[in-house]
Every structure is written in structure tokens, then in C-alpha cells.
UniProtKB/Swiss-Prot annotation:
UniProt GO MF annotations: ATP binding; ATP-dependent DNA damage sensor activity; damaged DNA binding; mismatched DNA binding
Keywords annotated in UniProt: ATP-binding, DNA damage, DNA repair, DNA-binding, Nucleotide-binding
Residue positions binding ATP: G607, P608, N609, M610, S611, G612, K613, S614
One Pfam match: MutS_III
Protein name per Swiss-Prot or TrEMBL: DNA mismatch repair protein MutS
Native species: Bacillus cytotoxicus (strain DSM 22905 / CIP 110041 / 391-98 / NVH 391-98)
GO cellular component: cytosol
Protein task: This protein is involved in the repair of mismatches in DNA. It is possible that it carries out the mismatch recognition step. This protein has a weak ATPase activity.
Gene3D superfamilies: 1.10.1420.10, DNA repair protein MutS, domain I (3.40.1170.10), MutS, connector domain (3.30.420.110), P-loop containing nucleotide triphosphate hydrolases (3.40.50.300)
């Protein structure tokens, strides 16, 4: 390092402490980066990479960003999961001896961003800290630095359960210790897409002990200690807005695993990963940012305590029944800014005058809101607003101190109102009168000299001056004007009188700016005292906002208040999928009942694709979740039990466990339900077993149904294409067949989307293929083959005389499919021994088949033909079909 210049040595010394972050090194008006940081930053930010002399034989890579535009570049790096250390000059370069002293004043990470475009106003920005203990348990602590919220929980399940809970927090960054293995870290970084950071210290930092007063378990305190130490180490400033740690237990809420949340599209859609089209999108009628965040938290964790759910429902009913109260509340909430994050900015020291003006305007709405709620005859409302302080003293303080239209910067003056501070008023009087005197002097000088173009101006370098054009210089009295500056076409002068006033005016203006900044800083400290009250008030306002949102959407969409029962029965009359109905936008939506009395546990659902089976299943789950977060539900009547968990297997494979086949994912999710579901759970399985061969899939599907029916007793909707399973209704007393109805008109199928009792009699697979616009010739041939199969006729083909040349890619051997290819080859070899006319084919002409005589079949052949009739060819791959053909041929040959 000795060969480098002192400044580069300083850079390297600081960088050594922040190896995993980009070091923004302040040099004048730029943040500079050097060495590997420069190369990588230039690529990520798409800025110019240059170099400089650093004292060594080779030039040092360098890039930089302007100080005033740094925030944009920092956000770009944070969005990509990087960290940025801000290294500032901490002494005046004018007074520095040698290299200016520099220190890192903040480490910005994905989990500690306070503001910017990466922060969604209606989402929390959680930082998580995970601690593992010798007994295999974990403690998970989370902090949202923007709001000060802190939570902690103990996790005793599997590693997968822990990862899913971490994922559920939505954290962008997780703090661990050095005992975590590389495999575990990979799951966090690659699977959960989180930035991993390290913190070994777990002792609660000095001054933050009051925040863990209610946390008595050592494990939980350890996790919180790790979290707090990391936050303090990265932020290096006051964190007075941190709230007391809240303990939560996962068994206090309905469990919905990540796969189910995705399949049900609770907060984002499966396809676009956006809010629009999700249940959250439909329910979000909140008027405040903090209300939007609370709504999402409620949706992530539905309640399972019947009394608490009913409290929310009663409050929603109050708002539904009182239109004028609800509309008045909404109008007031529109004027309420984000109290939580404003309080955070106050504590953080980043609040400006406009923020405080927003705070004042928000607080001005609070007394009327609290008064209106206090008049309600509702115990939940009374409990909700109990202890809420409208902070009227703070409102008055801000009203008499902050100008109505202050500048964005707190260092430009014009922030504090007249009358707030006597000294400031005095300086302002001098400044204002001084400027009036300047205007009068200009008028007087014009009269004395007779120069109409004479003017008095000001600039930062020369101060005040009298400017006269060169053509008029001869008109100036001698000895009165002192030359100050010469221009191309004019001369600038100063007089003793102007010099005296200039001193007074400039001193006053400098003192005004400095005094206003000092007064604002002091005001900010006064506001800090109110932070706990503001945070409590924010929770009250947020909850009221969510409840009015439920009431608003319930009235708009014709939802009804659900009745919760302790019995294990479901009674939903005219239930609807709320999002699908909304997207249809006025088009006819077909509602469906779901009646499952206490003695009915399983609905076995059959019916064609596109008929609405999956929608019906999702509909029940969404109705259940909506009820348990305290919202009305889309139905004309609803009686529901309180479910402890929801398990779903709907749609294609889309999970956190990368690299697994569709069938493996099905089995893992089935295992999750079988291992963890109780009789108070809801299970939704769509087409379980489709990812393997027909008989394997059918056998597994039947075994799973029987296990759920006999061993678990959970309310279950199980859809299937295996129509053979419908006979289970005869042996399983708590299972009932239902189907999605359809009718045929003029050879075309019409899906009625109506759930009816009994099993489906047809699959309508060919009709679905028609809707998918498969070629007409293919559809016609499929109908032909289907008719022959249903009539138990043989299907034969002529010997092929001409084969089209296959594309080159089809001729290449596929290593993975060699076993299957071998089976196909065996089929072909054995088929040569059979009479040519009896070979099976999908290409025999109708004329030739008519000429053939129907053979007399023995019992074995009749049984095989019956099996062929049941095969759903459209639900098999070509290779699966060939394997099935091979099996049937072997069976016939054994005869």
C-alpha cells in the first residue's frame, strides 16, 4: 500500500471494512469509486470507466457520479441487491492538514433503504435476522426501518417451514451468523432472492433495552439483538422511531404456504407477478399508504380466533350500514399522509419542512376522525381508539412555525413563519427594509446624476454595486463613486453609504438562513418527543382505513357478512370468485353453491377442462380467506367454520424448490398437506397424479383421497380426470361426487359452469380441442377414432408406402429417452409378426374399415378392449400412448 498516494491509501483503509459494498468515496462534488468497485459499478450503472494516477506504476480504474445525482445511482445498485457505503468528508478541506478526514456515515442495503423508488408506499421494507439454535429451532426477527416496526417469532418446524416463513415476510435482506453453510446461504440468495449479511453480536445494544421489555425468551432476545446490532452498525445515527418488539406466533394465524398464496393469487398474479388482477388489487380501497400496508399484512396472516374475526366483521358492518359516516371518513383519510414513515424521517434526521407541513395537515384531520368513531355504539371501535392522542399540541406547534409553502431544502431559508422567533423577525426587518432602502437609493442616484439607465445590482462575488454604462460615465460627480468592476460596456461602482447598508443587509440575510436552519433543527427535536404517539395514532388510522376499505368493496361488489360457526360445516349460497367476477366487468358470472355439512368432507369434482373446476376450488379458498381477515364475502349467504390451514395444489408447477418435476412437486405438496393438515383445514387438490402414468396416477389419487377421508377428515375439494374414481362414493361415506355441467348443441359443447351433484358422464376433450382451434382434419379424425373406441371396433391401418423425411433434429438420438425408445422398438419388432391388416393405427381410411369383418372376441380380448375404451388419449403424451399399447399387446399375447 505504501506505493499509493495518501488519498488512495485512505480509500483502501476504509474499503477494507466494507468489502461487500460499493464504496462511494466523496471527492469534492463527486462520489468516486476505484479498483474493482469502479469496474463493476461502470458496468452495472452504465457509466464511463476511466483511470487515474494513484502513485503506483499502473493507473487505477476509476468511475464517479455527481453528488447531487447520487441517490438515483444508489437506488439502481440497491435494486440489484448490492450494498453501498457512503464515505463523506468529515472536516473542512480549508482547515485540513494533509488528506481530508473521511468516514463512512451510512451503509445502505436492500433491507435498510429509507426512501426512494425501491420503497413501495403500500408495502413494508423488512430486514430479517435469522438465528439458529443447537436444538434445531430458529428465531426470526424483522425490522422495517421506514416505519420502526419490529417483530420476532420462534420457529420449530422443518428447514423448509423456516424458509417459507422468511419468504412470507417479504424481506429483501437477511442477517445471519457465520455458522450457516454455503448450501443454506444458496437457498437464501438463489431460491428466496435475498441479500445475505452477517452479524455476530447478539447482545441488545445500549439504549435499546426498553424495546425488548416484553420479550422474555432468551432465543427471541438473541435474534432481536442480532437485528438491532446490524441496524445500528449500518445506519450510524439516531433511531428513536424504533418501536417495541412485537412477539407473534405462527399458530395464531391461518397457515397458507407460499405455493398456495401463489396459486390463489392473493397479492400478485401468477403470470405477471403484479398486483393488478390479484385479490389484494380487488380489496384495496384504502386511502392511506399505511392502511395499504396493513391490508397486505392482514391478507398474509388471516386470523383463526373466531371472536377477533367477528369484531372486525361487526365494524365492517357498521361502515356498510352508515354510508355518510363511511364517505366522510374516506374524505378525511385522503388528507392523511404516511404518519409512520414521517415519524421515521423525523427520527432519522431526513425530514424537511414540507414533510412537517404534511404532518400538520394530517393531524388536523385526526380530531374529527376520532370523534366520529367515538360516537359509534361498537365496543371494538371504542377499544380501537382508546389511548389515541390527536397530538393537538404538535399541530399547534407546526402551525405557528412552518411556512405554508416552504422550499425542499432546509438550508435555503424561508421555512419559519414570522412571529415564531424575535431575533429572526429582527433580521428579516433589516433585510426587508434594507432592500427597500436600496430601491430608494437607486431612484435618488438617477435623479442626482440624470442617468436614467443607472441601476443598483447584486451578485455573490462583488456584492451590491451601482452600474453605469460607459456612455454616461462623464455624468458622474467626481470623488463620490469608487470603481469596483469594469465590464465591456459599463463600469460598476460603490459608495460609502451603499457599502454600509450592504454589510447590514448581507449579514442579516446570512444570519436569517443560519438561524432558520438552527430553529428547524430544534423544531425537529421537539417533534421527536411525539413519535410514540404518532406511531400509535398511525395504527389506529391504518386499521380504520382497512375496515372502511372492506366496507366499500363489500357494498360495491354485493358481498355479504359471513356467519362463523364452531361446527365443521360449509354453507355458501351463490358463491362467486371475486376477482374473476370483477374482471368479467358486467358480463354474466355463474355463481355456485358449496354445501358441505358436518358429515361431508370430500367433494370429488369431475368435468371437462375449461369448465370452471379450478375457479370453483379457488373460489372457496378466497371466500374463506376473506372471511378470516374480517371482510364480507362474495355470496348471497355464507356460513363457514374457521380453518386453521389451507393447502392447495392447483395449476402448473411453480414453486420455490427449483429443479423438481411437475409430478415431484405434486407429491411434495400432497405430502405437506397429508403431514400437516387437521380436520380444521381446507385442502384443494386439482388433478393430482397427472404427472405420471395413468395407472400410477389413478392409484395415488385414490390412496390420497382415502387417506384424507379416513385419517384426516379435512374439508377437501378434489378434482380429477380419472372418472373411475367416482365409484369411491359407494365406499367412502363422507365423499360426494359433483361435476361441472355442460350441454351439447348442434355438435358443439356449451359449458354451463354450474356445479351439480353426481359424476360427469363425458369429458368433452375433443370439444375443448376445438375451442383451442386445432386443425379441422385432426378434430374430425379424433371424433372418428372416439366413435370406433366407444363402439368397441378395431382400428387398423394400411402399410405405409411413403414416409416424409423427418427434420434433422427429430433424427438425432435423445439420450434421456433411450429406455422409452427401446420399448417402442420392441413394439415395432413384435408387431411385424401380426397380420398387417390388424395393426393399430390412427390413419386407416374409413372405406377400408367398413370392408373388414368384425372378429369374434374372447373374454381376455373383450377385457382389453374395455380398457382401451377408457383410455383418455388426449390426456396422454405420444410416448405414454405407445407404452400403454405395448402393455396391452403383451397382455393379449399371454393368452
Amino acid at each position: 500500500m505504501a506505493q499509493y498516494t495518501p488519498m488512495i491509501q485512505q480509500y483502501l483503509k476504509v474499503k477494507a471494512d466494507y468489502k461487500d459494498a460499493f464504496l462511494f468515496f466523496r471527492l469534492g462534488d463527486f462520489y468516486e469509486m476505484f479498483f474493482e468497485d469502479a469496474v463493476k459499478a461502470a458496468h452495472e450503472l452504465e457509466i464511463t470507466l476511466t483511470s487515474r494516477d494513484g502513485g503506483s506504476s499502473e493507473r487505477i480504474p476509476m468511475c464517479g457520479v455527481p453528488y447531487h445525482a447520487a441517490q438515483n445511482y444508489i437506488e439502481q445498485l440497491i435494486e440489484k441487491g448490492y450494498k453501498v457505503a457512503i464515505c463523506e468528508q468529515v472536516e473542512d478541506p480549508k482547515t485540513a492538514k494533509g488528506v481530508v478526514r473521511r468516514e463512512v456515515v451510512q451503509l445502505i442495503t436492500p433491507g435498510t433503504m429509507m426512501e426512494g423508488r425501491t420503497i413501495d408506499e403500500k408495502e413494508n421494507n423488512f430486514l430479517a435476522a435469522l438465528t439458529r439454535f443447537e436444538d434445531g429451532s430458529y428465531a426470526l426477527a424483522c425490522n422495517d426501518l421506514t416505519t420502526g416496526q419490529n417483530t420476532v417469532t420462534l420457529l420449530t418446524g422443518s428447514v423448509e417451514d423456516v424458509l417459507l416463513e422468511v419468504y412470507a415476510t417479504g424481506s429483501k435482506e437477511i442477517v445471519v451468523d457465520s455458522t450457516f453453510s454455503q448450501d443454506e446461504l444458496n437457498k437464501l440468495t438463489e431460491t428466496l432472492k435475498m441479500t445475505v449479511s452477517y452479524e455476530e453480536e447478539t447482545k441488545i445494544p445500549e439504549g435499546l433495552e426498553p424495546l425488548v421489555k416484553k420479550v422474555t425468551q432468551t432465543k427471541l432476545v438473541t435474534a432481536v439483538g442480532r437485528l438491532f446490532n446490524y441496524v445500528l452498525r449500518t445506519q450510524k445515527r439516531s433511531l428513536d422511531h424504533l418501536q417495541p418488539v412485537e412477539i407473534y406466533y405462527t399458530n395464531q394465524f391461518m397457515k397458507i404456504d407460499v405455493h398456495s398464496k401463489r396459486n390463489l393469487e392473493l397479492t400478485e398474479t401468477l403470470r405477471t407477478k403484479e398486483k393488478t388482477g390479484s385479490l389484494l388489487w380487488l380489496l384495496d380501497k384504502t386511502k392511506t399508504a399505511m392502511g395499504g400496508r396493513m391490508l397486505k399484512q392482514w391478507m398474509e396472516r388471516p386470523l383463526i380466533q373466531k371472536e377477533k374475526i367477528e369484531e372486525r366483521l361487526e365494524m365492517v358492518e357498521t361502515f356498510v350500514n352508515d354510508y355518510f359516516l363511511r364517505e366522510d371518513l374516506k374524505e378525511k383519510l385522503k388528507e392523511v399522509y404516511d404518519l409512520e414513515r414521517l415519524a421515521g424521517k423525523v427520527a432519522y434526521g431526513s425530514v424537511n419542512a414540507r414533510d412537517l407541513l404534511q404532518l400538520k395537515r394530517s393531524l388536523q384531520q385526526v380530531p374529527a376522525i376520532l370523534e366520529a368513531i367515538s360516537l359509534l355504539d361498537n365496543s371494538y371501535a371504542a377499544k380501537l381508539i382508546e389511548g389515541a392522542d390527536p397530538c393537538e399540541a404538535l399541530t399547534k406547534l407546526l402551525d405557528r412555525s412552518i411556512q405554508e409553502n416552504p422550499p425542499l431544502s432546509v438550508k435555503d431559508g424561508d421555512i419559519i413563519k414570522d412571529g415564531y422567533n424575535e431575533k429572526l423577525d429582527e433580521y428579516r426587518y433589516i433585510s426587508k427594509n434594507g432592500k427597500t432602502w436600496i430601491a430608494e437609493l437607486e431612484k435618488r442616484e438617477r435623479e442626482i446624476t440624470g442617468i436614467k439607465s443607472l441601476k443598483i445590482g447584486y451578485n455573490r462575488i462583488f456584492g451590491y454595486y451601482i452600474e453605469v454604462t460607459k456612455a454616461n460615465l462623464s455624468l458622474l460627480p467626481e470623488g463620490r463613486y469608487e470603481r469596483k468592476q469594469t465590464l465591456a460596456n459599463a463600469e460598476r461602482f460603490i459608495t460609502d453609504e451603499l457599502k454600509e447598508k450592504e454589510t447590514l443587509i448581507l449579514e442579516a440575510e446570512e444570519k436569517i438562513v443560519q438561524l432558520e436552519y438552527d430553529l428547524f433543527t430544534a423544531l425537529r427535536e421537539e417533534v421527536k418527543v411525539f413519535i410514540p404517539k404518532l406511531q400509535h395514532l398511525a395504527k389506529v388510522i391504518s386499521e380504520l382505513d382497512v375496515l372502511q376499505s372492506f366496507a366499500t368493496v363489500s357494498e360495491e361488489e354485493r358481498f355479504v357478512k359471513p356467519v362463523l360457526t364452531n361446527k365443521r360445516e360449509i354453507f355458501i349460497k351463490d358463491g362467486r370468485h371475486p376477482v374473476v367476477e370483477k374482471v368479467l366487468d358486467g358480463k354474466l358470472y355463474v355463481p355456485n353453491d358449496c354445501m358441505m355439512p358436518e358429515n361431508m368432507d370430500v367433494f370429488l369434482i369431475t368435468g371437462p377442462n375449461m369448465s370452471g373446476k379450478s375457479t370453483y376450488m379457488r373460489q372457496l379458498a378466497l371466500v374463506t380467506i376473506m372471511a378470516q381477515i374480517g371482510c364480507f364475502v362474495p355470496a348471497t349467504e355464507a356460513i363457514l367454520p374457521v380453518f386453521d390451514q389451507i393447502f392447495t395444489r392447483i395449476g402448473a408447477a411453480d414453486d420455490l424448490i427449483s429443479g423438481q418435476s411437475t409430478f415431484m412437486v405434486e407429491m411434495l405438496e400432497a405430502k405437506n398437506a397429508i403431514a400437516n393438515a387437521s380436520e380444521r383445514s381446507l385442502i384443494l387438490f386439482d388433478e393430482i397424479g397427472r404427472g405420471t402414468s395413468t395407472y400410477d396416477g389413478m392409484a395415488l389419487a385414490q390412496a390420497i383421497i382415502e387417506h384424507i377421508h379416513d385419517q384426516i377428515g379435512a374439508k377437501t375439494l378434489f378434482s380429477t380426470h380419472y372418472h373411475e374414481l367416482t365409484v369411491l362414493e359407494e365406499s367412502l361415506t363422507h365423499l360426494k361426487n359433483v361435476h361441472v355441467s355442460a350441454i351439447e348443441e348442434d355438435g358443439k359443447v356449451v359449458f354451463l359452469h354450474k356445479i351439480q351433484e353426481g359424476a360427469a358422464d363425458k369429458s368433452y376433450g375433443i370439444h375443448v380441442a376445438q375451442l383451442a382451434e386445432l386443425p379441422d382434419s385432426l378434430i374430425a379424425r379424433a371424433k372418428e377414432v372416439l366413435a370406433q373406441l366407444e363402439g368397441q371396433e378395431e382400428i387398423t391401418i394400411p402399410k405405409r408406402t411413403e414416409v416424409k423425411e423427418q427434420p434433422e433434429r427429430m433424427q438425432q438420438p435423445v439420450i434421456e429417452e433411450q429406455p422409452v425408445i427401446k420399448e417402442v422398438a420392441e413394439v415395432q419388432q413384435e408387431s411385424e409378426e401380426i397380420v398387417e391388416e390388424s395393426q393399430l393405427s390412427f390413419f386407416e381410411t374409413e372405406e377400408r374399415m367398413e370392408k373388414q369383418e368384425k372378429p369374434v372376441l374372447d373374454a381376455k380380448e373383450t377385457a382389453v378392449l374395455a380398457q382401451i375404451k377408457k383410455i383418455d388419449l388426449l390426456d396422454m403424451t405420444p410416448l405414454e400412448a405407445l407404452n400403454e399399447l405395448y402393455r396391452l399387446q403383451k397382455k393379449l399375447k399371454k393368452g
